From Swiss-Prot:
UniProt entry tagged with the keyword tRNA processing: no
Functional description taken from the UniProt entry: Displays ATPase and GTPase activities.
Native source species: Cereibacter sphaeroides (strain KD131 / KCTC 12085)
UniProt-recorded name of the protein: Nucleotide-binding protein RSKD131_3085
Binding site for GTP: 58-61
Family to which the UniProt record says this protein belongs: Belongs to the RapZ-like family.
Length: 298
């Protein structure tokens, strides 16, 4: 009988591991950060504390090394009393370097060198651990709020048990978002950008959505899109997925993709599915007018 639910949280410094640990604590986990690896087995020697445990482990641990951590994962996986999950909070090297340069912090593996050298060294060190993760989350384009919301869908046992859906709009000129399961190209729809009265608005405005909906191709497209997604969601849930991410792209990420993402998100919510909506380019545009210190990353 499994008595302990244990989540090991690791990943490169600056990726958002501390944010993840704090989020798990808010969900009711008993959190222990930077515990030496050799002490971890002692946690399961006594009686269960009755709630799940989250352990934060990274290169700052006194006895940390990838081989020892993998051996610990193997040992805990084989223990019939333990339900183990490994969460790896990841981030691209370029974004990690940007975060270090922005905060002017020294990297723990390169205190006397550039952040880039420390980041590269740590990514190489953690590579064997990364492939053992049960959950991999890339925070390169996430805010702390985004990360907490994603973890809540994965680990909060008090949250809805149905598959959660996220829809997001984006601009193809700025690249396809990371971690999207399905992408739909909305550039075939007529573009409100060329209507002077609509150009400065975005797809959340009724006038923009009405203009896009007036395209003869919109109604059959949206009907088929909605039916396809509603057909797929139960199948994805049966396969054990907890989350499905849908991306909608157009040229500028302001009108067509935003409108379609909004309309589909509303349709899925009306059908009873938990839905979150994000509009990447609109967020970037809003962030550009804020002071630099408010642009916090995970």
């Amino acid at each position: 009988m499994q008595e302990y639910r244990l989540v090991l949280v690791t990943g490169p410094s600056g990726a958002g591991r501390t944010t993840a640990i704090n989020a798990l604590e808010d969900m009711g986990y008993e959190v222990i950060d930077n515990l030496p690896l050799s002490f971890v087995p002692r946690l399961i020697e006594g009686p269960s504390i009755g709630r799940p445990i989250a352990l934060g482990l990274d290169v700052r641990n006194r006895d940390f090394n990838a081989t020892a951590l993998i051996e610990l994962i193997d040992r805990l996986t084989q223990d019939p009393r333990v339900a183990l999950e490994v969460l790896y909070v990841d981030c691209s090297a370029s974004e990690l370097i940007r975060r270090y340069n922005q905060t002017r912090r020294r990297h723990p593996l390169a205190p006397a060198e550039t952040p880039a050298e420390g980041v590269e060294r740590e990514i190489d060190l953690l590579a064997p651990v990364r492939v053992r993760a049960d959950h991999l989350i890339d925070t390169s384009e996430m805010s702390p709020h985004d990360l907490k919301a994603e973890l809540s869908r994965w680990f909060d046992r008090g949250a809805a048990t149905r598959l959660a859906v996220s829809v997001q709009s984006f601009s193809y000129k700025r690249g396809v978002p990371r971690g999207v399961d399905m992408i739909f190209d909305c550039r075939f729809l007529k573009n409100p950008y060329w209507v002077e009265s609509l150009r400065a608005l975005d797809g959340r405005e009724a006038s923009v959505a009405d203009y896009i909906s007036s395209d003869p191709r919109f109604a059959p497209f949206f009907e088929k899109l909605r039916d396809l997604v509603l057909f797929l969601l139960p199948a994805q849930l049966e396969e054990g997925k907890a989350h499905l991410s849908l991306g909608f792209g157009c040229t500028g990420g302001q009108h067509r993709s935003v409108a379609v993402a909004e309309l589909l998100g509303n349709a899925l919510a009306e059908a009873g599915w938990p839905v979150s909506k994000r509009h990447r380019e609109l967020e970037r545009r809003a962030a550009a007018v804020l002071p630099t210190h408010q642009g916090e990353k995970a």
